[in-house]
């Protein structure tokens, strides 16, 4: 089965896309000022999204475990199985890193540092500009706060849109994952039924062989010769009917 047709790679691509969006949203979340009340809301949604992606990775690992029981049936080898295990492990690590970063409250210091410098400059105007600061400082500060607030709100809006899209992607992956799981279970059931049928057929053949052996033994040498002759005549008749008519 090619990679384009393999359900594993379809789900893998969806999950990787979700992880990329999650990391992008996380990096934007790091730049949100802690003073913004929406930071906690976005953090909560990030953690929830991490949990959803981890669930998808769990389902994919279950599918790998099922495929590992009979790789030849699914057209894969041990090297491919190991490759898939490494990918799921790496995906889980990426999600765990984002989740740990959110829970630890690690935010970049860029915006905070800029605000601190701004406040220092406001508190320490030079003597030549003191009067101008008294006149316009408050207005500049209000404008800066408003601009910073607008930037933060725009950033939060973008994150909400990305989280909504990420949630839809996770739901879509969940549906595909469940479909794959159901298909694997159905195939495993078919294999079990085939094994049972083969065992039953084998038992019937052994029974027939024993019966034939008993009949041959009871018939003796003369009876065996007569049976062989009968089978030979029957074979000749069938040959004539099939190939000469």
Swiss-Prot record:
CDD domains: SNARE_NTD_AtSYP61-like, SNARE_Qc. Disruption phenotype: Abnormally branched root pattern. Hypersensitivity to inhibition by Na(+), K(+) and Li(+) but not Cs(+). Abnormal PIP2-7 trafficking and subcellular localization leading to a reduced levels at the plasma membrane and abnormal accumulation in globular or lenticular structures. Expressed in root, leaf, stem, flower and silique, but not in hypocotyl or young leaf. Strong expression in the vasculature and in guard cells of the leaf epidermis. It comes from the Eukaryota. Coiled coil: none annotated. The chain crosses the membrane at residues 225-245. GO terms for cellular component: SNARE complex; trans-Golgi network; trans-Golgi network membrane. Residues 153-215 form the t-SNARE coiled-coil homology domain. It is a single-pass type IV membrane protein. It holds the Pfam family STX6_10_61_N. The keyword Protein transport applies. Induction: Not induced by osmotic stress or ABA treatment. GO terms for biological process: abscisic acid-activated signaling pathway; exocytosis; Golgi vesicle transport; intracellular protein transport; plant-type cell wall cellulose biosynthetic process; vesicle fusion. Its main location: Golgi. It is found in: Golgi apparatus, trans-Golgi network membrane; Prevacuolar compartment membrane. SUPFAM superfamilies: SNARE fusion complex (SSF58038), t-snare proteins (SSF47661). Keywords: Abscisic acid signaling pathway, Golgi apparatus, Membrane, Protein transport, Transmembrane, Transmembrane helix, Transport. Residues 1-224 are cytoplasmic. One of its GO terms (molecular function) is SNAP receptor activity. PANTHER family: GOLGI SNARE BET1-RELATED (PTHR12791). The exact location of the SYP51/SYP61 complex is unclear, but is probably on the trans-Golgi network because of the likelihood of containing chiefly VTI12. Interacts with VTI12 and either SYP41, SYP42 or SYP51 in the trans-Golgi network or with VTI11 and SYP51 in the prevacuolar compartment to form t-SNARE complexes. Core constituent of the SNARE complex required for membrane fusion at the trans-Golgi network. Also observed in the SYP121-complex and cellulose synthases. Colocalizes with PIP2-7 and SYP121 in trafficking vesicles and at the plasma membrane. Interacts with SYP121 and PIP2-7. Belongs to the syntaxin family. Vesicle trafficking protein that functions in the secretory pathway; the fusion of phospholipid vesicles containing SYP61 and VTI12 is triggered by YKT61 and YKT62. Together with VTI12, required for membrane fusion. Involved in osmotic stress tolerance and in abscisic acid (ABA) regulation of stomatal responses. Plays a role in the exocytic trafficking of cellulose synthases (CESAs) and the transport of cell wall components to the plasma membrane. This is Syntaxin-61.
């Amino acid at each position: 089965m090619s990679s384009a047709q393999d359900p594993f790679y379809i789900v893998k691509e969806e999950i990787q896309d979700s992880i990329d969006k999650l990391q992008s949203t996380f990096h934007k979340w790091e730049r949100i000022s802690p003073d913004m009340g929406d930071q906690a809301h976005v953090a909560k949604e990030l953690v929830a999204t991490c949990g959803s992606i981890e669930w998808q990775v769990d389902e994919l690992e279950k599918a790998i475990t099922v495929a590992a029981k009979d790789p030849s049936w699914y057209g894969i080898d041990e090297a491919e199985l190991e490759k898939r295990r490494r990918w799921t492990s790496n995906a889980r690590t990426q999600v765990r890193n984002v989740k740990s970063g959110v829970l630890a409250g690690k935010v970049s210091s860029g915006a905070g540092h800029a605000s601190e410098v701004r406040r220092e400059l406001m508190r320490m105007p030079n003597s030549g500009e003191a009067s101008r600061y008294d006149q316009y400082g408050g207005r500049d500060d209000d404008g800066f706060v408003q601009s910073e607030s607008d930037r933060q709100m725009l950033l939060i809006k973008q994150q909400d849109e990305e989280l909504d899209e990420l949630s839809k992607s996770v739901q879509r992956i969940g549906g595909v994952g469940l479909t794959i799981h159901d298909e694997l279970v159905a195939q495993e059931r078919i294999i079990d039924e085939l094994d049972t049928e083969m065992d039953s057929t084998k038992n019937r053949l052994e029974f027939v062989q024993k019966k034939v052996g008993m009949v041959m033994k009871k018939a003796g040498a003369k009876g065996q010769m007569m049976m062989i002759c009968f089978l030979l005549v029957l074979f000749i008749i069938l040959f004539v009917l099939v190939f000469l008519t």
